[in-house]
Each structure stands twice: as C-alpha cells, then as structure tokens.
Design a protein with these regions (language model features):
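Internal, hydrophobic cores of structured domains that mediate oligomerization or house catalytic pockets
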Residues: 89, 109-110, 116
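Conserved beta-strand in the GNAT
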Residues: 53, 57, 62-74, 85
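A short, internal acetyl-CoA/4′-phosphopantetheine-binding micro-motif in the GNAT/acyltransferase core
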Residues: 88-97
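Conserved acetyl-CoA-binding loop-helix of GNAT-fold acetyltransferases
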Residues: 96-111
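A short, polar/charged loop-to-alpha-helix boundary motif
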Residues: 75-81
Length: 243
C-alpha cells in the first residue's frame, strides 16, 4: 500500500481555488470531526494571524485517507515575534497504525525553522486522547506538560498566550491547562480501550484529564528548535520512547 502525500499552502491560493479546496478539506474534516461546525474550520484556516496554512493530504490511489491542517501564526510575546504552529489532523481508522501525520508535520516545521532561523517556532495543540498525547510525549523530552518535569517559564508563557483561542481554559495544576477540544468520531468502546494502558504518559494524561470523554483536552506545547526536531526524528526512526 503506497501512500502519496501533497502539501498545499492554503493561504497562497487564489480566491476561487481557496473556495474549492476548502470544500474538499471540509468534506474530509467532517468525517473525522462530525461534531465540529463549518464556521470552526473556516475561522481556523482564515486566521488573520496566519502567515502560512500548510495543508498536508494523504492519498491511497485517488482516495483521500488523511489530512493535517497546520496554520502558522505570527504572534508577539514580550514585544518579540514568534511563530506558533497548530494542527487539526485526522486519518481514516484503517490507516492509523503509523505515525503518518507526525512525520510529515516535522518536515514542514523543519522547513520553516530553516527559512526563519531567527524567530522562535513553537507547536501548541490541545489533545483529548491519552493515546495521542503519548505519541507526542514519548518522542521528545521537551513536549510539555509531562510527568516529573517542571514546565520552563518560556513554554508556559507561550501556552498562556494561546488561551485567546479557547472559549474556556481550566487550570488544573502548574502548567496544566484543560480546554474544550475537537471530538473525533469514535465509539464508546474505542474510548474505553484508550484507558487500558499502564504507560506513564497515559497515566499522566488520565490524572489530569479524566473527563476527556466530555470533549476536554490537555493544552500542550513544544519549542520546535533543532534540538527538539532532531531528537524527535531520531526517536521516530528507531522506535525509541522517552519518559
């Protein structure tokens, strides 16, 4: 099974192409996030702070089987510019066994890091499944929050800056913020199976977000510097996990 990927910067498309491509994105997005509104996706890809909106799509033959929308926002933190990458990703269930979206997202981040080396690049996401949190936390020691480590001040400042994009943020500890998250299409049995793990990252997530069943997610942050990117690439390549 050969998976083909395409990357299109939604922000650079002419108006008519934007309209047509948005309809394609929306159709697939609703397969993954059936409870999300059209307005949510529209605002996400038309964020006025976005300098680029890479959209990575994955195909098997002509069938679209996965999608990752990654707006890159240019914001100000303490009067200095920073870039913040967010992600809205989904893959059809039968293709979820590989780190498909993570691998390509790293490549996109690396290109942007090389293009603008003087401006810090951050990744901020709200994760509502312990399995997905574990995927990220187990690949880099610099993905926060995490068990046994205090979140650095700079990381917390970026996380707090992104509160503006959430309707409600609940602080549940030092550096622990829980907010509404996109609910993917899953069955109750699938959600229950996500809990049957003893991994340290699973336990940490469940300790702080036991109500993820209700659409709550853990706000997470990672600085995408060369140290973090290279560590993640190596851990993915060799199947290594970190605690």
């Amino acid at each position: 099974m050969k998976i083909r990927e395409t990357i299109i910067d939604f922000a650079t498309l002419p108006a008519q192409q934007k309209h047509d491509f948005f309809q394609q994105m929306l159709e697939f997005d609703q397969l993954i996030f059936p409870f999300a509104s059209v307005e949510q996706l529209y605002q996400y890809v038309h964020d006025p702070e976005a300098v680029s909106v890479p959209v990575i799509q994955y195909f098997v033959g002509e069938q679209l089987i996965g999608q990752n929308i990654m707006p890159i926002l240019k914001l100000q933190l303490q009067d200095k510019p920073i870039f913040v990458v967010t992600s809205r990703a989904g893959v059809l269930e039968q293709y979820r066994r590989s780190n498909l979206t993570l691998k390509t997202a790293i490549r996109v981040a690396l290109r942007y890091r090389l293009r603008y080396p003087a401006i810090p690049l951050w990744f901020v996401t709200t994760l509502m499944q312990p399995k997905v949190y574990t995927l990220f936390a187990s690949r880099s020691r610099y993905f926060y929050p995490r068990k046994g480590y205090t979140m650095p001040t700079a990381y917390q400042s970026v996380l707090e800056l992104m509160h503006r994009y959430k309707s409600q943020v609940d602080k549940r500890g030092q550096g622990i913020y829980v907010a509404p998250a996109l609910m993917p299409k899953v069955t109750p049995d699938q959600l229950i199976r996500l809990r049957k793990r003893s991994d340290v990252h699973y336990q940490f997530f469940m300790q702080h977000v036991p109500d993820y069943f209700d659409g709550k997610g853990l706000m997470c942050v990672c600085r995408l510097d060369f140290k973090t990117i290279s560590e993640t690439i190596m851990n993915l390549a060799f199947g290594k996990s970190v605690h």
